[in-house]
């Protein structure tokens, strides 16, 4: 079998995951190929501004990885970007127009939108104001699509392995596979830093795939181990243990509650989410069910329950939104002081999210892991969005606003069965496959086959001085690259 990789994201552990999978396929006797960018893309997820030093670092890491693998991977150089392809609009009227743009049957605009939304942390990105960036992102997506498709046809590839699957440098490769009838798989971080997640035929954001994996994991694990490991996921999160990503509650003060918190009231905690990862996903339902968005949901819930002075809601803004100035955060800030029965807890507030959850009558989420956590800790959880635990019955999933309000008003609302939360916790903690060759030292560093995958010393020194020069140029607004 001929397996094709487009390793366009070099930070650890993702490049090392590519290397791990390449080594596996080679060990199984397959032919492995890699389409390598050596600066041809005008922008990418790891190097938005196409800085020469970062580009050189990426190439140096890739070359070292190939050396560690014994030069057994056939490298297919990415062709230079040609003139701007026909069919690209001069500008896109808004982010929705960008999302719907297709080129030769491939919805490359969706991948460009996903990358740009993440870059600017703005789900309603002004595509007119950022016209130049939009054009570069679309051009990068088209170039990945065209180059990867040509490479796959040239070698007659049987399978492709792609990182993540939502960005402009990865999703177009999936489009190419689908047009050619080639199978593909994607990879992402696993449940801990010592694991990687390799998914056949779909992407990490696929809710149905998650449901199948959760069920298979639970059935294949002895009951006592499943219960213990499922519980560990939740106790570790509450203890701020960082398994696969950074803890957003680490800076909060344990047991701290909002000022004037009244335990005698029927308190409802609402935990929102960061929208940037969910706003441009192919095949994923709208982030919020029944309502236009989370702001609409919060305002309608608060306004409808205003007739009962014993009900008070607390909106905990996700800590990941701290310091941002975006459409989402501006609209959330506008809720401050608007309703007497709503307290808004800012993202950088030291209020303990777990203490707030613990002392609430019910918890409302839009996809946050807190929805499953609330169930585990014995609290009624109401899910108004979509989450990887959608099918686990660990949260109430109302079908309309009236049902939502009925759940909120109900005194003594029982939590959903804890078993669903345990199933999800087991899967999330043990999600993926243990690395055999990569040894993680932290969430973003490690060694592969006992060696650090980094450029050789002379090149590292050059990269260091180039970065110093680039940072100085950026401070003085005198950049000479990517114009």
Region locations from a protein language model:
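Long, C-terminal catalytic modules of enzymes
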Residues: 308, 394, 398-483
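Histidine-anchored nucleotide/phosphate-binding helix
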Residues: 12-34, 174, 291-306
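Conserved catalytic-core segment of nucleotide-activated headgroup transferases in glycan assembly
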Residues: 239-334
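A short, glycine/small-residue-rich beta-strand->loop->alpha-helix junction that serves as a flexible
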Residues: 8-17, 162, 276-282
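Conserved nucleotide-sugar donor-interacting segment of glycosyltransferase catalytic cores
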Residues: 144-199
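Conserved N-terminal ligand/cofactor-binding loop architecture of enzyme catalytic domains
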Residues: 30-142, 189-249, 441-450, 467, ...
